[in-house]
Amino acid sequence: MLIPRQQAPDLSVDTLGAGRFRLIDEKPERMTLVCFYRGLHCPICASYLKELERLTPAFAERGVATIAISSDDEARARAMADAQLGRADLVGHGLSLADAGKWGLYISASRGKTSIGIDEPALFSEPGLFLIRPDNTVYYLSVQSMPFVRPNFAEMVQALDFVIKNDYPARGEQLLEQPAA
């Protein structure tokens, strides 16, 4: 289980416009925002990624680099970027399900065509959002088991202002032992 202040798992995927993305090689001023999304078949992901793209300059002003990653293959990732985004360099693809599991992402099985008529892959990862510090430690994480109710990017930009101003530490670093059943 990932918890704040611990090392993030390895993450290396191809992008549509910027070559290979390797998290360990990223050296943003403050953090890298990693947005895992379900894929081309998800209409909620499309609007979510549009909002991320819109606010990417605001994140950059705060020293936060952004990338959106799915387990889609290159063709599906390109179709999503072409239909929904103005920048292909924001999109990574080919996340293995094993790597998705290392990030604590939930995996779902296909239920056929979605509400927008696109087939779901046989298996795919559900959404997750992470802020990773330049030393590759987890600062923030949120993982969803459904496509609904994701962290709000505009609120995150505002929260980053507070975090930066107050040098606010990563929280949630303690896990309690669970009693035996």
Name each model-derived stretch:
Residues 1-181:
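Chalcogenol-based redox active-site neighborhoods
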